[in-house]
Amino acid sequence: MPISRAGLAPMTPIVAALVLAFGAAASQAQSLSEVVQAARGVDAAYLGARSNADAAHYRYEQARSAHLPTAGLQVQAARDSSTSPTPISTTAIINQTSKTTSLGGTVNAQQNIFNRQNDLTIDQAQKNEDIAQSQLAQADQDLIVRVAQAYFNVLAAADALNSVQGNSKAIAEQLASAKRNFEVGNATITDTREAEARADLARSKEIAAENDLLVAKVTLDQLVGRNGVAPHPLILPATLPPVMPSQVSDWVALAESDSQALKQARVGLEVAELATARARAGHLPTLVANATYGRTRAREAIDGEGTFTGNSRNAGVSVTLNVPIFSGFLIQNQVNEAVALEQKARTDADGARNQVVLATRTAFVGALSQAAQVKALEAAEASSKLSLDATLLGFKVGVKVNLDVLNAQSQLYDTQRDAAGARYQYLVAQLKLRQAAGTLGNNDLLPIDALLVR
């Protein structure tokens, strides 16, 4: 592809795609909170967790039905016909036919009076619903972090492209200056060749930056379920919030009380304990009350005798006590299995705590490190500007060569790119720290929205 060395290069297909796909996106610029809310409506992982929470609630309602009475209606209809020999005298017998038609119904009702296993099953279902709700909250926190990462990836890619384009323009100007100086005999061809090489390299970087921006935009659009999502850029100079609380022990304490992963492990242990108690309850008797009420209407027609009609009723109440005596060691082995699984759940809970504490400490150190990197890069950016100004002045008076100017320019634009990326990563690092502690929510997005151009 030909490169214009006197100015900016012509528009590439990637840039054209960006203009066509996202040129009208300014009207769709959205804050981070708005983008996260939109993603909740389309993200498969979040929607799956929400459906799982709904299913867990319905399983709990199913378990509760064991405490409620059950009733059923049975309706019977029958028609019988029979023929039998009937003596009519001492010497004569005739075949007599009898036809019977009946219609009846019976209502049966049952109520559990005592069943300890049912009680514990309900408690387990309630705990499992709590786990599903915690998983939903965890999925929401994960979605916030993923959207924020994609959101700031777009901004970082846009800043990187701006830096590369600025560097390309500066190199083009330096190339034009080198050519003029060579033509008038004030410089050698070496300066021109160095500027041309830098221009070619800058063009390659610009193409890569354009592609990175396009990929970042497509990724964000897919995550949000919309086309042309345009993140609000960061207000500069940016005043980034510090990591608060400032002590890692405070974050660890928050994680031990609020971490969704730790909550799930602890409730999972409670479920396992209930499973053990439920298995042991297999040794206990059960008591069930039953009630029955039925009515039947019958009509019988007998040849030679006429038709007879009658009604019958029956009602009854009973209590059934079931006492387990021997089950082939089934219950004992069920108890042993539940005890083993309970021990596993206890070990898993201890392991989950260790993992949560480690993740929180790691996220805390990462956030502090990212904050320090932002400060260092911002200082480096200021120093690079001063260095470039001094180099340009030295070039004008003849104590610096063209290569020195090109190096100073590249250093400045690279530092600007890195500083911008570090600021975005610091904001994401803060969200990841709150995610590790289990406190991440919508309110944590509002301070970030305040840092963005509206």
Residue ranges and their predicted role:
Residues 2-3, 142-256, 366, 370, ...:
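Periplasmic alpha-helical coiled-coil/stalk elements that build and connect Gram-negative outer-membrane
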Residues 2-28:
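Gram-negative bacterial Sec-dependent N-terminal signal peptides
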Residues 3-4, 81, 418-454:
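Acidic, low-complexity, intrinsically disordered peripheral segments
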Residues 27-76, 82-84, 111, 126, ...:
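Bacterial Sec-pathway N-terminal export signals of envelope proteins
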Residues 37-47, 54-69, 106-124, 134-141, ...:
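A glycine-/polar-enriched beta->alpha junction
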Residues 74-111, 234-245, 277, 290-327, ...:
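Small/polar, glycine/serine/threonine/aspartate-rich low-complexity segments that form flexible
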Residues 102-104, 149, 194, 314-316, ...:
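Transmembrane beta-barrel architecture of outer-membrane proteins
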